[in-house]
Amino acid sequence: MGMHAKKPGKILADLVSVLPDDQLMIGREASPSGNGSCHVFRMLVRVGYHETDGQRRVHHANYLNYFEKSRVEMLRAAGFDYRGFEKEGLMLVISELKIRYRGAAEFDDLLRISTWVTDVRGARIVHRHEVDREGELLVECDLVCGCIDERGRVRRLPKEWVKCFAPDRAENSYSQASRDGQGDT
């Protein structure tokens, strides 16, 4: 079906949409980082025993798997098909990653993974991921993906993605101007 499973942005048009299993949610809200508004995707993950290390805590590398799943599911919830994206000869590769571990998750914990786009333009898309357990922030991650073709050449992201995931730039500009003392008080 190409790059899109359904009409782009259809789900994002709703204030909050809950998918059938009540575990995946997406909606437009104030940016958790405080800059304007954006689409925030949330999913729940139960920590499996195989995801833990010798101390029964989630091995640090497994958070990357949670983030990957969250990014793919966010695309799906927004009406985009990553498999179709790859069939068109495009793919996303991680070019930059910054993680801060604030606490440890353990076997059988129920975690909420929150994902949103903080910037999207040209060939890059920047995601913010946060993991919390019952409101306690455990992990923060800023992740930059670049769009390339099968030969590794840089390619622009689909316009539909940019339009769908771009943070509310007007609101972001206003927020920045206010912090710089240039906006209305």
State each model region's role.
Residues 47, 57-58, 93-94, 120, ...:
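Hydrophobic aliphatic residue packing
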Residues 45, 95-97, 142:
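Short, well-ordered beta-strand segments in beta-rich or mixed alpha/beta enzyme
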Residues 2-43, 76, 106-110, 118-185:
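HotDog/MaoC-like acyl-thioester-processing domains
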Residues 52-102:
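N-terminal first-folded block
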Residues 42-48, 100:
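Generic structural detector for well-ordered beta-strands
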